[in-house]
Every structure is written in C-alpha cells, then in structure tokens.
Regions:
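N-terminal amphipathic, basic helical "cap/leader" segment at the start of enzyme domains
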Residues: 1-66, 163
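C-terminal helix-cap and adjacent tail motif
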Residues: 135-163
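Conserved hydrophobic/aromatic beta-strand scaffold that supports enzyme active sites
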Residues: 70-74, 138-140
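Small-aliphatic-rich amphipathic alpha-helix that forms the alpha element of a beta-alpha
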Residues: 15, 71, 77-125
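Generic preference for hydrophobic
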Residues: 29-31, 71, 159
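Short, electropositive alpha-helical surface patch
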Residues: 123-136
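Short, charged/polar surface micro-motifs in flexible loops or helix N-caps
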Residues: 34-39, 45-46, 77-79, 121, ...
C-alpha cells in the first residue's frame, strides 16, 4: 500500500517547506502509481535498451515494480541574479529529504533513487519535462514487507569540527 491522497497532500506540504531562496518555487513532483508504474517501466526499458548492456535491461525494466508508488522530484531552473542553479537544485533536494522524513513519520518505507536512470535527458523528455527541468531523483514509496534494513550506527563526533 501507498499513502492516501490526504497523506500525500500533507507530505507535499512538508516537502514544499524546504528552503527556497527568493521563493522561486523550483520544485515539483510527478506521482507515479498503478498504471503509471507500467508506463515508467517501459520508459526505463527503452532507456536501458540504448544505454546499458543487454544483460541489465531487465533490471531497469523491473525497477519501478519494487514499490507501489514512485515520486519523481523535478527541479525547474529559473534564472535569477541572486539564486544560482545549484541553490535551486539544493532546494529540490531538501524537499526530497522532507518527503522521506514525512513518509517515515507516517510509517511508510522509502528510498531515494538516483543514478543513470534519474540523471538523463531521455527520461526527462519521456516524462514531459521542459529543457530547464531535470529529475533530482525517484522516491520509491511503500510499506516494508520484511525486516527493515539495519543501518550502521554513526558516531557524530567523527563528522564534526569545532571552531
């Protein structure tokens, strides 16, 4: 199962509270579920048939079926004298983190997928994006069916310096 419309509305509200210098609103989303998963699978398969080894095509084709819902996070670059492209992309990335946190709070499992399949103009175009738009990643959403992956503990002191 995936989140309800009401839950998703709240999740998107949380996402859109991400830092956004000059209120440019560079972030949008494509919600993919049900028949959309099949469409995305075909797009991934078409991309793979032209860009990866033959033995890996099925991996790309089957990837969307790993979750009942996928959210494509889209960044729309808007030229601005004080807000460079990287800041706008970071705003969209922060919105993805907000989505992951909101999903976790609602007891959904999620993973942020990137790589070749996310960072290419072929998939962007197939999803109807404009030239100034790019996918920041795909968020796979569902309920965990088994034991949750054990994430190693981190000693935060190893990552902090004090001035």
């Amino acid at each position: 199962p995936y989140p309800t419309k009401v839950e998703m509305n709240n999740i998107y509200k949380a996402a859109l509270r991400a830092p956004d210098h000059a209120w440019l609103r560079p972030t949008s989303f494509i919600e993919i579920k049900d028949k959309g998963i099949e469409k995305l699978s075909k797009i991934f398969e078409e991309f793979a048939s032209k860009n990866v080894d033959q033995k890996n095509i099925d991996k790309y084709k089957n990837a969307p079926y790993r979750a009942p819902m996928i959210i494509a996070a889209v960044n729309t670059y808007k030229e601005h004298p004080k807000v460079p492209k990287i800041e706008q992309m970071l705003s969209t990335a922060a919105s993805v983190q907000n989505i992951l946190l909101a999903l976790n709070a609602l007891k959904y499992s999620s993973i942020w997928r990137t790589g070749k399949i996310a960072f290419n103009k072929f998939v962007d175009k197939k999803l109807g994006l404009e030239p100034n738009q790019t996918i920041i990643g795909f968020i796979y959403v569902g309920k965990n069916k088994g034991k949750q992956k054990n994430i190693p503990k981190i000693n935060s002191r190893e990552f902090v310096k004090y001035l």
